[in-house]
Amino acid sequence: MSLRNERLNQILTEARPKIARHWSLYDGGFGHGGTAAAVAGVDELLVGYFGKLKDMPDGTPATTILHEIEMLLRGLAEVNASCGGAYLETDERDLLVPIIIEAATVAGLDANEFKDADPTLQFRAKLLIL
C-alpha cells in the first residue's frame, strides 16, 4: 500500500470515532432530527469518498479530486434534505470539512489555491450545505 493510501486510511480511521462521538451528543445519538439511516449515509459517503481518492493514481488532476469533493457534498446534501434540511449545519461543517480537505490534500490537491484554503466552499455555497 502506498504511503498516500496509508495516510488516507489513517485520516478516516481517526475521523470515524470523532464523528460517532459527535452524533452521540444529540438526541438518541442521531443529532438535529437525524436518523440511523442518516448517520449511516454520512459514514457511507465518507468511506466512498476516501475509497475514490485511494483509487486515484499519483498526479491525478485537481479537477478529478474536486469532482469527488463535489459528489461527496451532493450526497451529504441529499442526506441533509432527507432530515428536513437541519441535520448538517455549522457544527457538522466544523467536523467534516477539515477531514474532506485533508484527504483531498493527501490525494494531491493544493488547498492553498482556493479561497480560505477551502476547496469545498464553492460547492457548499452552491448546494447550500454545511
Predicted regions and their residues:
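Short terminal alpha-helical segments
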Residues: 1-55, 127-128
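Generic alpha-helix signal with a bias toward terminal, lower-confidence helices
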Residues: 24, 57-58, 77, 88, ...
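Short secondary-structure junctions and interdomain/linker hinges
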Residues: 26, 56, 60, 79, ...
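Residue-level recognition of alpha-helical structural elements
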Residues: 38, 61-65, 85-92
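Charged, amphipathic alpha-helical oligomerization/scaffolding segments
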Residues: 41-48, 68-71, 75-78, 95, ...
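Mature extracytoplasmic domains of secretory-pathway proteins
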Residues: 53-80
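Amphipathic alpha-helical binding modules
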Residues: 84-130
